[in-house]
């Protein structure tokens, strides 16, 4: 990855630079309830989102679903599902609005997470990985457009996105280690933690959507 990323780093140039230096922090956006709720949902979402990515291989080996050689490819299946989730729902987000897409997909992600411990065969695990990868991929890819929708000043949209992503990164920082500690009590605990975090994220994002545009589902937001 480092090798391939070095190519655009070396050859890309900015077409135009901003006339003024933009701040790294904008306290005014914190007064926006939809933005605050979405950022909180982002925190919970990233807290639980990547737990299966870290532990699905160990789960498969410990439950004799697949050996070490086969279970290695389950992570690949998660990423294969993520490809579909990052592309197709974003197409519909252009028509309906990113917030209208984010909520149902993160909610479905929590449903799949709660079903994790009911997986007992390789076929079931393949289906789990593809669907979870799809729904989680949508959340990861659509967060940026959703934040742009919630920004109250497009000249500071980069600042607002950076602030929200920084807060969301804290959830990613603590989520997987906490799941590892919970794993000492069995697999139900980290799976429940993953699903609960995703549900909290869905509720916060729903709150952001309602605060932004009300309960009218026809509003593009």
Residue ranges and their predicted role:
Residues 1-20, 41, 204-208:
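C-terminal membrane-cytosol helix-exit motif in multi-pass small-molecule transporters
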Residues 10, 107-120:
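C-terminal ends and interior cores of transmembrane alpha-helices
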Residues 32-99, 103, 144, 175-179:
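Extracytoplasmic gate region of multi-pass secondary transporters
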Residues 66-75, 102, 121, 125, ...:
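Juxtamembrane helix-start elements in MFS-like secondary transporters
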Residues 80-85, 135, 167-171:
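MFS transmembrane alpha-helix packing/gate-lining sites
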Residues 138-153:
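Intracellular juxtamembrane helix-capping segments at the cytosolic ends
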Residues 151-188, 194:
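A late C-terminal transmembrane helix in Major Facilitator Superfamily
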């Amino acid at each position: 990855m480092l090798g391939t990323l070095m190519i655009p780093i070396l050859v890309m140039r900015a077409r135009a630079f901003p006339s003024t230096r933009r701040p790294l922090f904008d306290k005014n956006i914190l007064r926006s309830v939809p933005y605050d709720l979405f950022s909180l949902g982002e925190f919970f979402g990233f807290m639980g989102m990547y737990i299966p990515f870290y532990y699905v291989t160990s789960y498969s080996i410990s439950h004799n679903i697949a050996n070490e050689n086969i279970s290695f490819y389950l992570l690949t299946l998660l990423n294969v599902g993520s490809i579909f989730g990052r592309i197709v729902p974003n197409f519909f987000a252009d028509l309906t609005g990113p917030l209208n897409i984010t909520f149902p997909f993160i909610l479905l992600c929590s449903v799949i997470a709660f079903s994790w411990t009911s997986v007992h065969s390789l076929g079931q695990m393949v289906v789990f990985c593809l669907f979870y990868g799809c729904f989680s991929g949508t959340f990861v890819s659509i967060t940026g457009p959703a934040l742009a929708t919630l920004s109250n000043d497009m000249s500071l949209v980069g600042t607002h996105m950076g602030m929200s992503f920084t807060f969301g990164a804290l959830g990613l920082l603590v989520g997987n280690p906490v799941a590892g500690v919970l794993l000492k009590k069995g697999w139900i605990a980290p799976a429940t933690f993953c699903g609960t975090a995703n549900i909290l994220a869905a509720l916060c994002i729903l709150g952001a959507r309602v605060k932004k545009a009300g309960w009218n589902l026809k509003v593009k937001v």
